């Protein structure tokens, strides 16, 4: 897509991971000395070029790891004022994460923390990431009893750590020989807009196939409908 091509003017495909139809992770660590820019300056440069080329206003989250970058965009950026063009760029490191988000609620706002997990945590008096971090100091074994293997990543996230980087994501090999792309829409879409979404998802899959040097003979499309709007 045009937005993806804009990113490629600044970074290599090896340092970009399309996370969803409208979101990517970009590791700019090695590019900052080359461009003589801070992470904020480089993000702003790319965001403004996207705006100029497409008319689309992007939001960016900057973090010292993937998890913090995701939260900077998902949570922090939503609560800061936009500039004159509607652009929001937020930043987090481990210390600012603990200061700004350890008391944030609900826990479902945090990446990879679903309602089922939150329900289990709240049953044990854990309502915030700060609660979870403090509980883990002396109750790590108990968290594994409550959450199973998921406790490891949640404890890391509670402290603002993320052991997985771009290289690990790129080298991950799933047990099944397939790739997929999903999108949950926030409201009902008419046919013409839905077709555009499907086309954009197909383009993302095309980029991923090309990057992995793969070909396919089969494509499956699944569409779900919410009952309320189907009945209309």
Question: Locations of the language-model features?
Answer:
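DNA-contacting surface of Y-family translesion DNA polymerases
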Residues: 109, 119-232
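Gly/Gly-Pro- and Ser/Thr-rich, intrinsically disordered tail segments characteristic of DNA damage-repair
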Residues: 1-156, 166
């Amino acid at each position: 897509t045009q937005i993806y091509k804009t990113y490629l003017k600044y970074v290599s495909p090896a340092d970009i991971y399309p996370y969803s139809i409208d979101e990517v992770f970009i590791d700019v660590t090695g590019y900052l000395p080359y461009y003589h820019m801070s992470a904020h300056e480089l993000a702003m440069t790319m965001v403004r070029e996207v705006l100029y080329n497409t008319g689309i206003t992007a939001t960016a989250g900057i973090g010292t790891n993937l998890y913090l970058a995701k939260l900077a965009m998902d949570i922090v950026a939503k609560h800061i004022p936009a500039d004159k063009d509607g652009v929001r760029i937020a930043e987090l490191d481990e210390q600012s994460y603990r200061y700004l988000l350890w008391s944030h609620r609900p826990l479902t706002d945090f990446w990879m923390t679903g309602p089922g997990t939150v329900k289990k945590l709240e049953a044990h008096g854990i309502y915030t990431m700060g609660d979870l971090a403090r509980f883990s100091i002396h109750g790590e074994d108990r968290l594994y009893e409550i959450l199973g293997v998921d406790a490891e990543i949640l404890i890391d996230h509670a402290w603002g750590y993320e052991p997985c980087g771009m290289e690990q994501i790129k080298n991950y090999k799933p047990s099944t020989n397939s790739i997929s792309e999903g999108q949950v829409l926030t409201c009902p879409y008419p046919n013409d807009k839905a077709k555009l979404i499907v086309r954009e998802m197909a383009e993302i899959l095309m980029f991923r196939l090309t990057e992995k040097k793969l070909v396919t003979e089969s494509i499956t499309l699944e569409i779900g409908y919410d009952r309320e709007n189907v009945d209309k």
